[in-house]
From Swiss-Prot:
UniProt similarity note: Belongs to the universal ribosomal protein uS11 family.
Gene name for this UniProt entry: rps11
Organism of this sequence: Cuscuta exaltata (Tall dodder)
GO MF, any single term: rRNA binding
Cellular location(s): Plastid
InterPro entries: Ribosomal_uS11 (IPR001971), Ribosomal_uS11_bac-type (IPR019981), Ribosomal_uS11_CS (IPR018102), Ribosomal_uS11_sf (IPR036967)
Keyword Ubl conjugation: no
Keywords in alphabetical order: Plastid, Ribonucleoprotein, Ribosomal protein, RNA-binding, rRNA-binding
CC per GO annotation: plastid; ribonucleoprotein complex; ribosome
Protein name: Small ribosomal subunit protein uS11c
Length: 138
């Protein structure tokens, strides 16, 4: 008599759903990185694990439109919408970079209904470190 072949569970036969567990996150940190060409918004929990993120490029803006304040506002709204559904009530905001989207992203975060404990500018500033690139001659 032939041996029966053991069944190997496939991806289709596995558990239904994405497998992610929805965690309640009452407090978090919102990181806004605003460069001249793009704005990236990442929402993390207090330990630094990324819960949600978005950028002007993933929000549907391409080319030079990614650096606009409206694109930054859209990216911030998109990143925060998911964490508000997960129950985030309070957040700290860390803003980095010289881009146009700094203020627009902060305005969108304020409008979301999350209580902001503090807003800090963490743009790296050299204490006369590396020599900057030469000036352009146009």
């Amino acid at each position: 008599m032939a041996k029966s072949i053991p069944r190997i569970s496939s991806r289709r036969n596995g558990p239904i759903g994405s497998g992610k567990t929805v965690r309640r996150i009452p407090k978090g940190v919102i990181h806004v990185q605003a460069s001249f060409h793009n704005t990236i918004v990442a929402v993390t929990d207090v330990r630094g694990r990324v819960v949600s993120w978005s950028s002007a490029g993933t929000s549907g803006f391409k080319g030079t439109r990614r650096g606009t304040p409206f694109a930054a506002q859209t990216a911030a709204t998109k990143a925060i919408r998911t964490v508000v559904d997960q129950g985030m009530l309070r957040a700290e905001v860390l803003i980095k970079g010289p881009g146009l989207g700094r203020d627009a992203a902060l305005r969108a975060i304020r409008r979301s209904g999350i209580l902001l404990t503090f807003v800090r500018d963490v743009t790296p500033m050299p204490h006369n470190g590396c020599r900057p690139p030469k000036k352009r001659r146009v």
